[in-house]
């Protein structure tokens, strides 16, 4: 076994990747990511002690969420970049260690090493370092929730929003994960606390996005192309998009969104740019084919990278920024001294490229985040009371490569016409281009936005609970049938559990990192379930 990773839904054989990641990461990269996470836990222990003394390190705060983000599925495949981050972390850890003394410090605090020692150490600090499978399962569940939370924290930070309370929790949780004597009950409570702070992190990002760009509104998004050279922007970071739009305005270059960047078109302060031309392509996993025909440069702002084939025509057109890493790609450095990122090289490259080749046409409707749906509340409530809407189906989450995900297309197609789908995240691409119609002018697919906008769906549910005078969110006519893929979906799930939502169905498979006993806890306490066939599930959910 040269590595072990089971953090994503597509993990090999449904048990774990041991030779190379299904995502495309090498065993070396996987092991180095384990070592980076090990270093992060040590930094967290030191910074938690410094926080108790009243002077935590802001540099440590940022390093921790940035490093966690790097280890998310499909974010960083660059061995050299991860080694640099480990070295940076060890230096930071040593600086913190000089300021505080810790009795009985864990190995995460004590270990130091040179690059030639990284590989050997990495093999001892991965997932399998914890022998008890239930403790291991819960530790990894918390780890993955923290990774998802870190992504949301970083995007909010880029817009000038941060929370000392969230930093404090993340670091105290990481410190707890260094304990060898931690109990299953303690970890269950830590898991629930992770969900609670996940709600706070999503609320913070929602505030950052809406205060910066306005509340999402019902918007029509073009799926075709124009005749100008284009830049395709993928990932989730709206600040990167804003700066790119500003720097390309008046240059004759059009900007197209890809996958999870689609909801940018719903924000008033982003869609005002006339050269934000449309959305190109589908969910992240189809990029190897779709990027070939785009013809212009592609900018990755966060996880959603699929390493290109060796003979891919677009390899030299890939640009990355933020936590992203891909060997051979052009890197856009971070902001310095409050100045925007410099996209001039990317823009110059785009000017030398042909316009994108059309791969589809038509439009999409979206923008149904919580403020927009609340504005339509009277119409929605009347439709429910009259029986025009029988049930809502929350089908948020992620898309992926597996053929079993065709279930979600079939499920959406077969739902009765008196049902409405509430969605967020790239799971929407399984059904957002189907002609599912509307109910009294309300589209049957209401897209709230990116995966973090699952927060909007929770706010909508809580608002409906209030409007209908119910004492329990689970009494609403809402079914949760969520598709998961990576760690941001994990924090969304934990956040929903923290909000009291029960009977969530998760697919296409349950996570490999859930041991049988942990799975039973989730089933017994929260009603977590899997999926079967579209026909069987629709019959069950509507009964």
UniProtKB/Swiss-Prot annotation:
GO terms (BP aspect) = nitric oxide catabolic process; response to hydrogen peroxide
Does Nucleotide-binding appear among the keywords? no
A single Pfam family it belongs to is Prismane
* GO cellular component annotations of the record: cytoplasm
Cofactor(s) recorded for this entry are: [4Fe-4S] cluster; hybrid [4Fe-2O-2S] cluster
Spell out the subcellular localization from the entry.
Cytoplasm
InterPro entries assigned to the protein according to its UniProt record, in alphabetical order: HCP/CODH, Hydroxylam_reduct, Prismane-like_a/b-sand, Prismane-like_sf, Prismane_a-bundle
Q: At the top level of its lineage, which domain of life is listed?
A: Bacteria
What SUPFAM superfamilies does the database record attribute to this sequence? Answer: Prismane protein-like
Provide the residue positions that the database annotates as binding [4Fe-4S] cluster: 5, 8, 17, 23
Q: What is its main location?
A: cytoplasm
The protein's GO terms of the molecular function aspect are:
4 iron, 4 sulfur cluster binding; hydroxylamine reductase activity; metal ion binding; peroxidase activity
What Enzyme Commission number(s) apply to this enzyme?
Answer: 1.7.99.1
Cysteine persulfide sites (modified residues): 398
Per UniProt, hybrid [4Fe-2O-2S] cluster binds at: 236, 260, 304, 398, 426, 451, 486, 488
Does the entry feature the keyword Chaperone, yes or no? no
Catalyses: A + NH4(+) + H2O = hydroxylamine + AH2 + H(+)
Q: Which UniProt keywords apply?
A: 4Fe-4S, Cytoplasm, Iron, Iron-sulfur, Metal-binding, Oxidoreductase
Entry's cofactor comment: Binds 1 [4Fe-4S] cluster.
Q: Give the protein family.
A: Belongs to the HCP family.
Query: What does it do?
Result: Catalyzes the reduction of hydroxylamine to form NH(3) and H(2)O.
NCBIfam families under this entry? hybrid_clust, PRK05290.1
| PANTHER family tied to this protein | HYDROXYLAMINE REDUCTASE
Protein name (database record): Hydroxylamine reductase
Q: Which organism is it from?
A: Bacteroides thetaiotaomicron (strain ATCC 29148 / DSM 2079 / JCM 5827 / CCUG 10774 / NCTC 10582 / VPI-5482 / E50)
Could you read off the lineage of the organism from its UniProt record? Bacteria, Pseudomonadati, Bacteroidota, Bacteroidia, Bacteroidales
| Gene transcribed to yield this protein | hcp
């Amino acid at each position: 076994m040269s590595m072990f990773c089971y953090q994503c839904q597509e993990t090999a054989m449904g048990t774990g990747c041991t030779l190379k990641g299904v995502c495309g990461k090498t065993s070396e990269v996987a092991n180095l990511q384990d070592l980076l996470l090990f270093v992060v836990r040590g930094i967290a222990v030191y910074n938690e002690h410094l926080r108790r003394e009243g002077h935590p390190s802001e540099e440590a705060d940022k390093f921790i969420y940035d490093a966690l983000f790097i280890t998310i599925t499909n974010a960083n495949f660059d061995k050299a970049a991860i080694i640099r981050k480990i070295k940076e972390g060890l230096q930071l850890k040593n600086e913190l260690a000089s300021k505080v003394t810790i009795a009985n410090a864990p190995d995460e605090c004590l270990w130091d090493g040179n690059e030639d020692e990284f590989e050997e150490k990495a093999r001892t600090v991965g997932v399998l370092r914890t022998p008890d499978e239930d403790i291991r399962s819960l530790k990894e569940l918390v780890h993955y929730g923290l990774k998802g939370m870190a992504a949301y924290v970083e995007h909010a930070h880029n817009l000038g929003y941060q929370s000392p309370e969230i930093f404090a929790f993340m670091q105290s949780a990481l410190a707890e994960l260094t304990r060898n004597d931690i109990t299953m009950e303690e970890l269950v409570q830590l898991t629930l606390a992770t969900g609670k702070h996940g709600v706070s992190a999503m609320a913070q990002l929602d505030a950052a996005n809406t205060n910066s760009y306005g509340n999402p509104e019902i918007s029509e998004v073009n799926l075709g192309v124009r005749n100008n050279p284009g830049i395709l922007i993928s990932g989730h970071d709206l600040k990167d998009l804003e700066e790119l739009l500003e720097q390309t305005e008046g240059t004759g270059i059009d900007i197209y969104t890809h996958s999870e960047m689609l909801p940018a078109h719903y924000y008033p302060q982003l869609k005002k740019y006339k050269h934000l031309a449309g959305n190109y392509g589908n969910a992240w996993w189809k990029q190897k084919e779709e990027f070939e025909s785009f013809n212009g440069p592609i900018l990755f702002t966060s996880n959603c990278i699929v390493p290109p084939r060796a003979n891919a025509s677009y390899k030299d057109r890939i640009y990355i920024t933020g936590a992203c890493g891909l060997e051979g790609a052009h890197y856009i450095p971070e902001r310095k001294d409050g100045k925007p990122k410099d996209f001039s090289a990317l823009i110059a490259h785009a000017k030398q490229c042909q316009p994108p080749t059309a791969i589809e046409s038509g439009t999409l409707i979206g923008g149904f985040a919580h403020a927009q749906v609340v504005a339509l509340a009277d119409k929605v409530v009347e439709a429910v009371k009259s029986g025009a809407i029988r049930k809502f189906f929350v089908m948020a989450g992620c898309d992926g490569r597996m053929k079993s995900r065709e279930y979600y297309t079939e499920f959406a197609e077969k739902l009765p016409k008196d049902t409405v789908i509430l969605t967020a995240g790239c799971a929407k691409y399984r059904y957002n281009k189907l002609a599912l119609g509307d109910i009294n002018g309300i589209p049957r697919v209401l897209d709230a936005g990116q995966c973090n906008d699952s927060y909007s769906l929770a706010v909508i549910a809580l608002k409906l609970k209030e409007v209908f005078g119910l004492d329990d969110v689970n009494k609403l006519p809402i079914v949760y049938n969520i598709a998961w893929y990576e760690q941001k979906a994990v924090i969304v799930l934990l956040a929903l559990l923290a909000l009291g939502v029960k009977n969530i169905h998760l697919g296409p498979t349950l996570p490999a990192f859930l041991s049988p006993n942990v799975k039973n806890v989730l089933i017994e306490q929260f009603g977590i379930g899997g999926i079967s066939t579209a026909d069987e599930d629709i019959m069950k959910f509507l009964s």
